[in-house]
Amino acid sequence: MPGRLPITAYSACNGLGTTTEAVLDSLFAGRRGLVHVAEEYGVSTWIGEVPGPLPALSAALSSFESRQARIAQLVTLPMLDAIEQTKRRWGAGRVALILGTSTAGIAESERAWIHQRDHASLPAGFAIERQHALHATVEVVRALTGVRGPGYVVSTACSSSGKVFASARRLIEAGIVDAALVGGVDSLCQMTLRGFAGLEVLSAEPCRPFSSERRGINIGEGAALLLVERGRHPSQGEFDHLGVELLGVGESSDAHHMTAPHPEGTGARMAMQRAIEAAGLEPSDIDQINVHGTGTSMNDATESRAIRDLFGPERSQGDLALVATKGYTGHMLGAAGATEAVFVLASIQRSLLPAGVGCDPIDASLGVHVNQTLRARASQRVLSNSLAFGGSNVSVLLGASE
Amino acid sequence: MSEPLGAWLRGVGLWSLGYPSFPAWVDAGMPEDLDPAGDQAPGKPSADLLHPRLRRRTSLLTRMIVTALAEAAGQGGAAHEQTRYIVVSSWGEIETTVDLLRQLAVPGGPISPTAFHNSVHNTATGYLSIASGNHWPSTALAAGPHALEIGLLEALAGLRAAEGPADALLILAEERLPAPFTRADADPSFALALHLARAPGRATHPSSLDLRIELRDSPSASAELVALDTLPSLVRTIQPLLRAIAAGSGHAAIALAQQLDAPPNRAGVERTWTLHLHES
């Protein structure tokens, strides 16, 4: 049986704020982090944008200049003290660095393409391996943290930074590393805003997951990082952590369609089921789910179906707490999984369920009940779902330490 | 590492514009350049696993991946619906992505929904799972100069985990960087597929390679140094492994990653691995 992996630190920034404290204060105060999109994008929708001018990159990282790198730096700096402790505990080479991203720095290539069209050359200082490449985000965080274990990006669209927990867990269990800095970073760009507009799933209003008035998704940007560690040090024994542990992760493929979820929610159900099995638990042990809940009619219907099938119709409308948070941040795509893991962690730590902004009135035909108002709830074991293009699904199971 | 990570290498598949299979590349004398030689016309990957209706929507990258993967799976006997797919690529669906950049450069212009969903890094694994009815997890990774090493770590750690399938197909693939991002040092278009498994396969599939591979920590592995501002070459990284597979006998110890040379702004890694390959 795989071990429980304690989480020792976390950090997040997104439309709700530039610091973890600001993000969580807004979440538990029921304040949305969405703004109407700027005209330059040519689409009418709301977005979750990291507020204010983003601090410049440190001099050593200036060649990685991009909004993506600045967001990565913003989320990493508050983690440095905790990462130093982890490196001291296990050795810098025994800490992996696994990040999810879907956009990487594509916004820089959008500008570069136009520059070469107009000037017959790429912009000065543009290098695709530093501005645009998926892996560049890992290099930025590696340079800031000095983490020296295996470093890579998982890029499976909207499940990317949920699947980093699965990779970390496998590497720790195989004895390759003892800890992992995992997370996700995504940045606003034309590609995702206009791409989702082309798929006709962008909502012109703030998104309303699980509401009968839902009209589609909002895109968000931001980042989240978490430190996951082996539970016990061979010589130092137990060490301080946050009282929340990674219990299991389940992944699956829909094998159905590139963009549409399986109509019966098969893949989503399998991912949740596998996460529960990986932790040696039963569905009845789960008391909360952070739903994927994008606010498209199709996602919310198939995800509800998966939840009803696995947990039964009674629990789905009763004591199983369902929390939808994309109304706060928008859909952060490659950063959604890690961000929502942070929300789950904070929810367990504070024994609070955040209100479901925009979820009212609940679509009764879905047969599930999504939490609507802030309320006290001491959840012990919580799943967090991320479902993606290509039918790539993941469910991350976090739990309070026993 | 407590004990070395290991597996059986049962099949290999290779597809490039110059060489449509691993044996074709071996027969040509194992050239380092995978592009067509001289006046030879570039090939087209058949990607037979995909239904024509799916196939006609796919890129060169996805077709190369599907074609190389079918070769590896056929040799070692991997059941397509019972395998974990792992794709590692630096640039992924870069031709589709750059075509979208052209569309995006027109303010307010239409964006092809098909091109958009085909631009994600996990496009090939998505199509593969649909074509084969495979519900196992698959993944799509990027690891810069460490692509081979990271792909093997993911594949072998996955085979060791109790909850996954007993077979993995690891694919390393790139599309050559298209204009305006063309680079003289960019890799050519190619896909390499390796069928890795918990058990050898010759009992049921006589063509199975059944080479035992083990990944060992080797702090002193002499990885090739790549100058700063040069793109690391995945095609060069895989050459020693391809040659060892072609030799098919004896023992080979292979360093897995290229190291970036004295980078002022790139922190290095501390861990390096050597892949040991030997006959069963």
Feature locations, PLM:
Chain A
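ACP-dependent fatty acid/polyketide chain-elongation machinery
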Residues: 1-64, 101, 231-245, 342-357, ...
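Condensing-enzyme catalytic core mediating Claisen C-C bond formation in acyl metabolism
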Residues: 4-8, 13, 25-46, 206-279, ...
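Active-site pocket-shaping loop/turn-to-helix segments
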Residues: 59-80, 123-133, 151-163, 208-224, ...
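Active-site-proximal alpha-helical scaffold in enzymes
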Residues: 80, 134, 142-145, 150-183, ...
